[in-house]
Curated annotation (Swiss-Prot):
Catalytic EC class: isomerase
Entry EC no(s): 5.3.1.16
Major location category of this protein: cytoplasm
Protein name: 1-(5-phosphoribosyl)-5-[(5-phosphoribosylamino)methylideneamino] imidazole-4-carboxamide isomerase
Organism lineage string: Bacteria, Pseudomonadati, Aquificota, Aquificia, Aquificales
A matching Pfam family: His_biosynth
Amino acid sequence: MNLKEFIIPAIDLMEGKAVRLYKGDFNKVKVYSERPWELAKNFSDLGFKRLHVVDLEGAEGGKPKNLEVIRKIRENFEGEVEVGGGIRSYEVAKALFDEGIDFVVIGTLAYKNKEEFLKILENFPNRVILAIDSKQGKVAIGGWKEETAVSPEEFAKEYENYPIWGYLYTVIERDGSLEGVDVEPYKEIKKHVKKPVIASGGVSSLEDIKKLYGIVEGVVVGKAIYEGRITLEDLQNF
């Protein structure tokens, strides 16, 4: 596997712009682009195979707010596109698939309304990624604002035998922080599941990516690319 397949660049959307939050805090926002679809085109031209898109306002408010921009991103990226944030119903998931999105990333709905979540899995098998967002060792939902008593391992195992594609596992305390990756949570969850796991949160350097390589099947990288911590030269020389 080459790094362009392992790394999944992230575009987080707010008010139609590409932004990054610091540790999931909606008050700590940095804008990186007013035209996110141009970022998507750049990532496509560079040969990345998958793009991770998050509708932050959707995650916070419960339904996607940046559909027009997501549509443009889809048009400008040749590989696979996965979208998360505010997918709390079958209708919203279907609307995204109808736009040509390859995978949807869902966490809150899987926790709060299993019946509705299973309806999506039934109609779109192997196209749903279960979002496991971990805060101090417990799953957080609702745009990371609501904490549960469930461990990431318990949440993952609940759906391991259903037709999900795999898992997106985010360590919230590190997300957008450039503090580096803790590989232990990923090693732990891999003991419990066989489906692919994508890591997310805290990647700050090529070293972090090397640490994760061989443990998980992919890694979402956002801020480290936008802040120049990981350069294209790094990727080509890996």
